[in-house]
Structure formats: structure tokens, C-alpha cells
Amino acid sequence: MKYTKQEARKRRHYRVRSKVSGTAAKPRLNVFKSNTNFYAQIIDDTTGTTLVSASSLNLGLKSGNIEAAKKVAEEIAKLAIAKSIVDVVFDRGGYLYHGKVKAFAEAARENGLKF
């Protein structure tokens, strides 16, 4: 039985999440992409709280393309640095490091986040 793309992504995400977790000193930068939007959160897994979040919905962008991912990365980096969060652990959410996810990661690094 072949897994669908969504099932394969969820399996990858569960496997990665068993190894990756964020702390207060180095929180987890999580990404999620839907068909129309791109979302990112910085999460402290020890307390289970979201420290910073940004999405293409909040920015008023009409699509979830590569340019939207870059703008979300700029916004989340700006918000994180304002809360003195610089070092993070990148959780790509089971997605392949390609396209929107890669553009997001590179833009976040360019704007001051370290991972």
C-alpha cells in the first residue's frame, strides 16, 4: 500500500519530532504550508507555548508562494529578534527542504536567525 503525500509528510514529521524539540534557550522554528498560505511559529516545547508566530494571512498576502514564504521569514525574524530570540532549531514539518521551505529558511537566516 502506497502512502499519499500527506501521509508520507506526517510520518516524516513524527519521525523528526521524536528527535527535535525546542527549549527556552533554543526554541523550535516550525513551518506549515497549506495550498494557499504559509505559516511559521517559534515554539518552546518545554512549556508548550508559542513565542512568536507569523503567516501569509497576517501579512495580507494573497498566495502562499515562494515570495510569501520569504516575507513570512522576514516578519518572524523581526519579531523573534525583538523578543531577543536568535538561536532556533529548524523544524521543516516533514516537508522536503526545497522550494518554499528552502526559500523560507534562507530568508530567515539572512534576517538574523541562526540555525
Curated annotation (Swiss-Prot):
An annotated GO cellular component: ribosome
Assigned keywords, A-Z: Ribonucleoprotein, Ribosomal protein, RNA-binding, rRNA-binding
What residue spans carry the region label Disordered?
A: 1-20
Enumerate the Gene Ontology biological process terms.
translation
Highest taxon listed in the record's lineage: Bacteria
| Spans through the membrane | none
Q: Does the keyword Ribonucleoprotein apply?
A: yes
Which spans does this entry mark as compositional bias, Basic residues? 8-18
Glycoprotein as a keyword of this entry, yes or no, is no
Q: Pfam families, from UniProt?
A: Ribosomal_L18p (PF00861)
Which family would the database say this protein is a member of? Belongs to the universal ribosomal protein uL18 family.
Q: How does it assemble?
A: Part of the 50S ribosomal subunit; part of the 5S rRNA/L5/L18/L25 subcomplex. Contacts the 5S and 23S rRNAs.
State the protein's purpose.
Answer: This is one of the proteins that bind and probably mediate the attachment of the 5S RNA into the large ribosomal subunit, where it forms part of the central protuberance.
Q: What is this protein called?
A: Large ribosomal subunit protein uL18
Question: What organism does this protein naturally occur in?
Answer: Mesoplasma florum (strain ATCC 33453 / NBRC 100688 / NCTC 11704 / L1)
